[in-house]
Amino acid sequence: MAAGVAARTLRGLAVAGGGETSDSEDDGWEIGYLDRAAQKLKGPLPTEEKNETFKKALTTGDILLVKELLNSGISVDSSFRYGWTPLMYAASVSNVELVRVLLDRGANASFDKDKQTILITACSARGSEEQILKCVELLLSRNADPNVPCRRLMTPIMYAARDGHTQVVALLVAHGAEVNTQDENGYTALTWAARQGHKNVVLKLLELGANKMLQTKDGKTPSEIAKRNKHVEIFSFLSLTLNPLEGKLQQLTKEETICKLLTTDSDKEKDNIFSSYTALGDLEIFLHGLGLEHMTDLLKERDITLRHLLTMKKDEFTKNGITSRDQQKILDALKELQVDEIKFGELPEVTKLEISGDEFLNFLLKLNKQCRHLITAVQNIITELPVNSHKIVLEWASPRNFTSVCEELISNVEDLNEEVCKLKDLIQKLQNERENDPTHIPLIEEVSTWNSGILKRTALAVCGFGFLLFICKLTFQRK
């Protein structure tokens, strides 16, 4: 009984990727007894017994017995109870030698069971990346199509990206896999890699031309998916305006791409491509995003921080050896980073005697709306701000600088609150005088009540904004 439980447990490991399960509980496979000694046929076997022996030879990885059974006439594409072929099973456990033997004997590399292809099974197998890579390479060499999706429209490259297999992703693209295909939920291979936190896969996909702006069905980009799943570093460089790696390998031929991707020493490749993205400061990320990596050493030698770089004048750029072309890239990036200031010039000139009540009401409504926007902005900052300092990826200035700015903000909000209270008192005084004027014809009660309500809401919004800034100040002080 214990052996049966173990067999069922290990059988689950051979289920094809994406959660595709067998339609039959009693599938006839006994997976897990890989330490059995190689066996030989003692004589001709009945067909039913031969099939059972074939299954056992496959599950134990007995290559010699598999060859002997194939020589005896058993079909290399035998279909067992739940529809899997021997090749699909071999791919699911990343048995490279078994895959090679079966393919050499004519096994169909393009077979699928309910749209679950052998290539998808290999890409989602539970094994080392080296074994998976070799199995995938063998299948591709026998013309397995890398763009055939499963029932959920996931292609092999999505499974490889989801499981963090960088080299497998590169190999699939080299054989024609579409990088930007989307599954039933709108996920691309890049989205899956970002969701699972596989940084090297994300970088490789960007290098291979992945579109980081494609959205899922719920309107999320890969960077937003990474942020939602707490992968802050991936979110940081996916959010960059430019991508220095994008399309780097797209112009190479298939053979050149395979050679470049698979013969390069993995450690050297990481040093040349990925090391610049590990433990980066904000200056390095900014420069990489603009394709200005060559400026990193120059700026560090001169102790130029990102804050200093972003506030430089033209003569300072030239003085520090920054070329006109590089200057323009930085200035263009600055334009994108700028936030529109609140424009109060459009508000009516209250001092004019001919101003109407509607114009003044419009002024108050706009002021109230701006206050609400400010409150929402601070609430978002409080929500997104990391609680622990070790979660901050970019280099930050001293928290004291932020605290001092918050203190100044609180002071300004208190002043604003005081001025709004004065405005309210003044309007209330004018209202009282008009009500006591015997020549005044009173307005409709509803309008007066509504105007008073607007003033109250404005005052409450300003007070609420001050309270939120006070909370923000306490948050920074705790840090």
UniProtKB/Swiss-Prot annotation:
Keyword check for Repeat: yes
Disulfide cross-links: none
ANK repeat residue numbers: 49-78, 82-111, 114-148, 152-181, 185-214, 218-247
Listed Pfam families: Ank_2, Ank_4, SAM_2
Residues carrying Phosphoserine: 22, 24
Annotated SAM domain residues: 276-338
Compartments, as annotated in UniProt: Cytoplasm
Swiss-Prot/TrEMBL GO biological process terms: cell differentiation; male meiotic nuclear division; regulatory ncRNA-mediated gene silencing; spermatogenesis; transposable element silencing
Superkingdom of this protein's organism: Eukaryota
Alphabetical list of PROSITE patterns matching this protein: ANK_REP_REGION, ANK_REPEAT
GO CC term, one of those recorded: pi-body
Keyword set includes Cytoplasm: yes
Keywords: ANK repeat, Cytoplasm, Developmental protein, Differentiation, Meiosis, Phosphoprotein, Repeat, RNA-mediated gene silencing, Spermatogenesis
InterPro entries: Ankyrin_rpt, Ankyrin_rpt-contain_sf, Asz1_SAM, SAM, SAM/pointed_sf
Function: Plays a central role during spermatogenesis by repressing transposable elements and preventing their mobilization, which is essential for the germline integrity. Acts via the piRNA metabolic process, which mediates the repression of transposable elements during meiosis by forming complexes composed of piRNAs and Piwi proteins and governs the methylation and subsequent repression of transposons. Its association with pi-bodies suggests a participation in the primary piRNAs metabolic process.
Subunit structure: Interacts with DDX4, PIWIL1, RANBP9 and TDRD1.
Designated name of the protein: Ankyrin repeat, SAM and basic leucine zipper domain-containing protein 1
Organism whose genome encodes this protein: Rhinolophus ferrumequinum
